[in-house]
C-alpha cells in the first residue's frame, strides 16, 4: 500500500507543483527568489518541529559537511528558479533539468574515475541529442517571437543564452552535490530526512542578500486580484494562493519521493520520477499552450528513451518476469 501511496504523492504533488510554479512565473517571471525562500522556510520549520525535535536532536552527519552541501543546494535552487526570468520557457526548463544523467556521468568519470558500459554511453548520447534539439528549436523561437525589432530580438536571445548558461551551471553543481552526498552517506549512513531539514534550514540566512527582491515581489503579490479559496471561504490575493499551493505541493512531492526511496529499489524511484517529468511536460504544453513543435517532441522522446535506457528498465523488467517462470518450473 505504501509504494502505491508514494507513487500517488509523487505524481499528484510534483505535477501540480509545476503547474503552480508556471502560474507564478507567467504573471511575475522574476519571482524565483520569493518562491525559493517560501519553500525553504516551510520545509525548515517542519523539519525543526518533527525531525530536529526543536533543536534537541544532534545531527548524525557533522554540521561542517552540511555547510558544504547546503552552499551547493542553495546555489542550485536559486539559479534554477532565477533562470525562468531569463527567457527560459517552462517546458525547456524541465527538459534541460532532465540532463542530470549527463552531468552525473561526466563528473563521475572525472572525479570518481568511474567507467560505464557502451549501453550507458549510448543512452547518454540520446539524452544529449534530445536536449540539444529542444534547446536549438527554443533558441529559434526566442528570436522569432521577439522580432519587434532586430535589436529586441538580439537582446532577447542574449538573455536566453544567459538562461541556458544558468541552467547548465545549476545542472553541473547539482550533479557535484549528488556525488558529495553519496560519499557522505557511505561514511555516515543514510539520513535523508535529516539532510532535507539541514539543506533547507542552514541556507535561510543567505536570503538576507535577496531580501530586497523578495520584498518587492511580496508587494507585487499583495496587489494581485483577490481570490476566494473554495470550501474554507478565505479571501487572499491570488498570487499568495499560488505560492501557498506551490509550497504545499512541493512538500507532498518531496515526501512522496522520500517514501518511495525507503520502500522501493532505486530503479523504481528513477522510473517514477522520469515518468512524472514526462507527464508534467505534456500537461505544461497542453494546459498552458506553450509552443512545442514536432522537433521538440522528437527531442523529448530522445530524452525519455535515453533515461529509460540508462536505468536499464527493460533489462530489469525482463529479469523480474523470468524469475517467477523459473520458480514455477522448479515447483
From Swiss-Prot:
**A Pfam family recorded for this sequence:** UAA
Subcellular localization, per the record? Endoplasmic reticulum membrane
Q: Does the keyword Transmembrane helix apply?
A: yes
Alphabetic keyword roster: Endoplasmic reticulum, Membrane, Sugar transport, Transmembrane, Transmembrane helix, Transport
Q: What is its main location?
A: endoplasmic reticulum
Its BP terms in the Gene Ontology are:
regulation of gluconeogenesis
Transmembrane spans = 4-24, 30-50, 59-79, 92-112, 117-137, 153-173, 201-221, 229-249, 251-267, 268-288, 291-311
Q: How would you describe this protein's topology in the membrane?
A: Multi-pass membrane protein
Q: Which reaction does it catalyse?
A: UDP-N-acetyl-alpha-D-glucosamine(in) + UDP-alpha-D-glucuronate(out) = UDP-N-acetyl-alpha-D-glucosamine(out) + UDP-alpha-D-glucuronate(in); UDP-alpha-D-xylose(in) + UDP-alpha-D-glucuronate(out) = UDP-alpha-D-xylose(out) + UDP-alpha-D-glucuronate(in)
Judging by the UniProt lineage, the source's domain of life is Eukaryota
Which GO molecular function annotations are given, in alphabetical order?
A: UDP-N-acetylglucosamine transmembrane transporter activity; UDP-xylose transmembrane transporter activity
Q: GO cellular-component terms in the record?
A: endoplasmic reticulum membrane; Golgi membrane
- Read off the PANTHER family from this record: NUCLEOTIDE SUGAR TRANSPORTER SLC35B4, SOLUTE CARRIER FAMILY 35 MEMBER B
Similarity remark:
Belongs to the nucleotide-sugar transporter family. SLC35B subfamily.
Name of the featured protein: Nucleotide sugar transporter SLC35B4
Q: Which gene encodes it?
A: SLC35B4
